[in-house]
Curated annotation (Swiss-Prot):
This is NADH-ubiquinone oxidoreductase chain 1. Pfam families: NADHdh (PF00146). The keyword Electron transport applies. It catalyses: a ubiquinone + NADH + 5 H(+)(in) = a ubiquinol + NAD(+) + 4 H(+)(out). The gene is nad1. It comes from Dictyostelium discoideum (Social amoeba). The keyword Mitochondrion applies. GO terms for cellular component: mitochondrial inner membrane; respiratory chain complex I. One of its GO terms (biological process) is aerobic respiration.
Length: 317
């Protein structure tokens, strides 16, 4: 009985640490994005709330939460309420297997990579439910686009991750990092890194692949009918996934935190800055161009890379 109580308390504290850490990370990721984009566009960015604008995310979050929650009359109220909670919950669950040290992880799972692939594949359900429950044509089209986009690019991303698993000989995230003590995987698998980066942009609905929430076409897309806490949960889920993808790319190709925690954090921030750089640089793709790129360009190249990695491993052995 005491052991069970200890496990429950330990699990609750770990979950609380993950949630608080994630909220702080998302807050500063949004501030970093606004500062970097301001610098690229030769302007100041937020600099009024707090020292050099450091408290701006807190002010924005409080303003958003304190606003009135407006539920459309024609919406399916239960599913409308569940959708943002589901999206945010999935983004938190994904973080449970991310190591914060070589021997320090909240949920040590031997097949951590498979766990991430499985959970991330159901992340689209929150967006689809939001689009359907809002009973709005713009939200519904945004949900459909998101479903098609994630299915199209998860195949290519899955093949690249299979290539990493094959090359490393393990599906454990910590062991993948340990295998990069001498040589980072980005050196032998540079084409795979480029494809994984493009797929990560698409999976997180980031520009130039932000078709599900294209303002010019869908008036913010799947979350057009959401306000206050619902909108905030979608926002938190989206940025939590962006940070997760930045960390995963660092773990898979740059060695993660295997040598130094500070260096590992810098790698993750560097990947996050590359997401921001792409947003500030490239225009949005058309929907047909997005589908063409996914099925006729990325998928064949990902398959070739996977075959090449298998051949390389067989030759080495």
């Amino acid at each position: 009985m005491e052991n069970m109580l200890y496990i429950i308390i330990e699990g609750g504290l770990k979950s609380l640490i993950v949630i608080i850490g994630l909220l702080i990370g998302v807050a500063f990721a949004t501030l970093l994005e606004r500062k970097v984009m301001a610098a690229m566009q030769k302007r100041r960015g937020p600099n009024v709330v707090g020292f050099v604008g450091l408290l701006q995310p807190l002010a924005d979050g409080l303003k958003l939460v304190l606003k009135e929650t407006i539920i459309p009359i024609v919406a399916d109220k239960l599913i409308y309420a569940i959708a943002p909670i589901l999206t945010f919950t999935i983004s938190i669950v994904l973080w449970s297997v991310i190591a914060v040290g070589v021997q320090s992880v909240f949920a040590s799972i031997n097949s951590g990579v498979i766990f991430i692939l499985a959970i991330s594949s159901i992340g689209v359900y929150g967006i689809i439910l939001a689009g359907w429950a809002s009973n709005s044509k713009y939200a519904f089209l945004g949900g459909l686009r998101s479903a098609a986009q994630m299915v199209s690019y998860e195949v290519a991303l899955g093949l690249i991750i299979l290539s990493i698993i094959t090359y490393a000989g393990t599906v454990n995230l910590q062991e993948i990092m340990e295998n990069q003590e001498k040589v980072w995987f980005i050196i032998p698998l540079l084409p795979g890194f480029l494809l994984a980066f493009i797929s990560a942009l698409t999976e997180t609905n980031r520009p130039p692949f932000d078709l599900p929430e294209a303002e010019a076409e869908l008036v913010s897309g799947y979350n057009v009918e959401y306000s206050s806490t619902g909108f905030a949960l979608f926002f938190l889920g989206e940025y939590a996934n962006i940070i997760l993808m930045s960390v995963l790319l660092s773990v898979f190709f740059l060695g993660g935190i295997v040598s130094n925690k500070i260096l590992g954090a810098m790698k993750g921030v560097g990947m996050l800055c590359s997401f921001i750089w792409v947003r500030a640089t490239l225009p949005r793709y058309r929907y047909d161009q997005l589908m063409y790129l996914g099925w006729k360009s990325l998928l064949p190249f990902a398959l070739l890379i996977y075959i090449g990695v298998i051949s390389m491993v067989l030759i080495i052995k």
